Amino acid sequence: MTETRCPLPKMARIRQTFARPRVDDIAAEMREQMQVLTPRIRPGMTVGLTVGSRGIQNILTMLEVAVQAVRGCGASPVLLAAMGSHGGGTRQGQKDVLDSLGITEERLGAPVITCDVTRAIGETPGGLVAYMLESAFGVDAIIPINRVKTHTSFKGCVESGLCKKLVVGLGGPGGAGQFHSLGQAELPRLLVEVTKEILGKMPVLGGVAIVENAY
């Protein structure tokens, strides 16, 4: 048998340079962002800060500042594991993932709460269910913290960010299961409609959106 090889096209090496906006003092910037939210925090509250499974640059510094800001209001910060089905959707799996990222009570000075039980809290007009982890009902206020970026699998007005953190992350295994059961064309609608349902039912104070540059 004769082997036929196709000639390779001509190639050239290139160098691509991306825009590189930077925040030189991460802690100072995070303190400034938290000042927008702290007027809504009352002494004695328990405030849940979401933590997820994605590796985000400088996330420990940002979480540390958020914990300090909440505590400075006379409130008690807790870290709510919010990663959908990651970590196998189990409490121990979630803890293992967070431990690997350095997100621990010892490092950040706030309890880390894992949970694998979800509750249906409502339904959208289009028949989508809003799920929420039981752990979210143990706090007086929720502040989602997440990176905002384009999604690798679908395009829409809302992709990866704070809405997805609420719908899929805090939605736990139930929210993640519904998300992954739908076609790509339906996912932006799910994120928008279910987020509206969650905001109407849960004490979400606001969120911190993180943007990373290409480096």
Regions inferred by a protein language model and the residue ranges of each:
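Glycine-rich phosphate/diphosphate-binding loops that line cofactor/substrate pockets in enzymes
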Residues: 33-48, 71-74
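Short glycine/serine/threonine-rich phosphate/pyrophosphate-binding segments
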Residues: 56-63, 88-89, 151-154, 165
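Catalytic cores of enzyme domains
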Residues: 132-134, 142, 148-215
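N-terminal amphipathic/basic leader segments beginning at the initiator methionine
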Residues: 1-29
